Amino acid sequence: VTAPPAQAARLRAISAGDAGVEILERPNRGRDIAPFLHALQSGALDRFDAVLKVHTKKSPHLLQGDLRRRVLFAALAGSPAATARALAWFGDPKVGLVGPGPYFRTAPVYWMDDRARVEALAARIDAPARLGFFEGSMFWVRPAALAPLRGLDLPLEAFEAEAGQLDGTLHHALERLIPLAVTRAGYETRAIGGRRLTAARLASAGPMA
């Protein structure tokens, strides 16, 4: 579990005595993405075949932001059956990323203000700058499939200070980069229902829509 200092103390008190809970204290910077990358780069996730990435961000700027978060969690791990259904895909060694198919976004409008930054980051991991990502940034992932992201070695200072940004930040770009990294590592992305998901082939320049 990653959390800012004030919340980390409370979480340690709640989880005291549970050896299965590890609290990683991180500043409130880079939203859920920067702490997740820290956990990845630190090696804390290496011992797992699959990791569930969820967060408590409510996206108050979206009319249905909290509802979306609840729907995503329910689909990924809202019941033992849902969890088993998602995890079953990791029995296939080719699968690296699993999430809710209806929230896998490939339409050009979802580039928003992040395209140039995604293109630059994709070039750094030698991946094509295509568009296809799980909106809401909640999914199951095989840590080994994120090896290209570890090579970015992004310091905390590379992430913008928290100012309620709605788009155009490093963490927004990385949200869109994750499936590209999975593909670059040689793995597939699947919807929970089994459909193979691929990023849209878009030109590297020109109109956004």
What does each model-found stretch correspond to?
Residues 1-209:
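ER/Golgi luminal nucleotide-sugar-dependent glycosyltransferases, focusing on the catalytic module
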